[in-house]
């Protein structure tokens, strides 16, 4: 691997310290690290690394190393986009369902990556677009979830939902979560959505506080084309949030279209633990 990109949580002193150590470690092995410009400005020793815009780094990296939590990883995954570059995600955060590599595993894992000795877990992504008056006004790639929800003081919202052109129902709820299997342990889980193994290919729909108690979470095939039309937006205080990081206000009549993305996120797996161990640890199963 010739080009290794490092993304770190720039406001976390621990992540910055680890980034500096990793840059030196790579330089000692003849490998130049590439970092984002805003990260480079926060590092004390930058002569051993090259810096440029985040999109440029992601465009031709052979490996992406993420230092932080799940949010840092999700942002990096969207930047990598269509290139299917392997991502080594190191957990410096708190919960960390996605960043399963521990700090103790960092250097042995990078060593194996340099030697081409690693395994990846391929995670399905979604494409989400917003149509307004017949025109696409937003288009984004999503790793975790697409969320439609109302403002704090708004009333219930009506979301006319169809799958593959066939009417499903009109959800009357505080919102609706459309999630990948990877995102099933995020906001969807908090709304009583199902836990889906991350290597499955499917899409879940989970209403948030539905008016009708029989509106339960649904799991759709991965090739489902989901269309959600906002029938009623009280005081126009309805928002679309993508991966909890990108958002916009929705208007009555807007249509959110969601399909499976053509590319996946490739996460390098830990050699010391499997997905079920991560679930047990993070959700504290078996504890009293």
From Swiss-Prot:
Involved in the regulation of the intracellular balance of NAD and NADP, and is a key enzyme in the biosynthesis of NADP. Catalyzes specifically the phosphorylation on 2'-hydroxyl of the adenosine moiety of NAD to yield NADP. It comes from the Bacteria. It is an enzyme of class 2 (transferase). The gene is nadK. The keyword Ligase does not apply. Keywords: ATP-binding, Cytoplasm, Kinase, NAD, NADP, Nucleotide-binding, Transferase. Its main location: cytoplasm. Its EC number is 2.7.1.23. This is NAD kinase. Its cofactor is a divalent metal cation. The active site is at 70 (proton acceptor). NAD(+) binds at residues 70-71, 144-145, 155, 172, 174, 185-190, 245. It is found in: Cytoplasm. Pfam families: NAD_kinase, NAD_kinase_C. It catalyses: NAD(+) + ATP = ADP + NADP(+) + H(+). PANTHER family: NAD KINASE. Signal peptide: none annotated. Belongs to the NAD kinase family.
């Amino acid at each position: 691997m010739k080009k290794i990109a490092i993304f770190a949580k720039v406001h976390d002193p621990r992540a910055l310290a680890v980034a500096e150590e990793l840059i030196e470690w790579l330089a000692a092995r003849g490998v130049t690290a590439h970092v984002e410009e805003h990260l480079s400005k926060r590092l004390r020793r930058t002569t051993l690394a090259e810096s440029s815009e985040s999109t440029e780094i992601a465009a031709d990296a052979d490996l992406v190393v993420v230092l932080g939590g799940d949010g840092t990883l999700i942002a990096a995954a969207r930047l990598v986009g269509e290139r299917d570059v392997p991502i080594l995600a190191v957990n410096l955060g708190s919960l960390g369902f996605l960043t399963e590599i521990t700090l103790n595993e960092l250097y042995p894992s990078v060593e194996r990556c340099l030697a081409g000795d690693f395994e990846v877990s391929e995670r399905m992504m979604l494409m989400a677009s917003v149509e307004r008056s017949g025109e696409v006004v937003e288009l984004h790639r999503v790793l975790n979830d697409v969320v439609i929800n109302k403002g704090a003081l708004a009333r219930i919202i009506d979301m006319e939902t169809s799958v593959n052109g066939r009417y499903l129902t009109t959800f009357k709820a505080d919102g609706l979560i459309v999630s990948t299997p990877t995102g099933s342990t995020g906001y969807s889980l908090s709304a009583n959505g199902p836990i889906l193994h991350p290597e499955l290919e499917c899409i879940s729909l989970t209403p948030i506080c539905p008016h009708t108690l029989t509106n339960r979470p649904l799991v759709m095939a991965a090739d489902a084309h989901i269309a959600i039309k906002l029938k009623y937006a009280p005081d126009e205080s309805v928002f679309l949030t993508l991966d909890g990081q990108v958002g916009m206000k929705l208007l009555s009549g807007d249509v959110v279209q969601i399909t499976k993305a053509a590319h996946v996120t490739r996460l390098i797996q830990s050699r010391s633990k499997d997905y079920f161990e991560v679930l047990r640890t993070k959700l504290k199963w078996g504890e009293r």
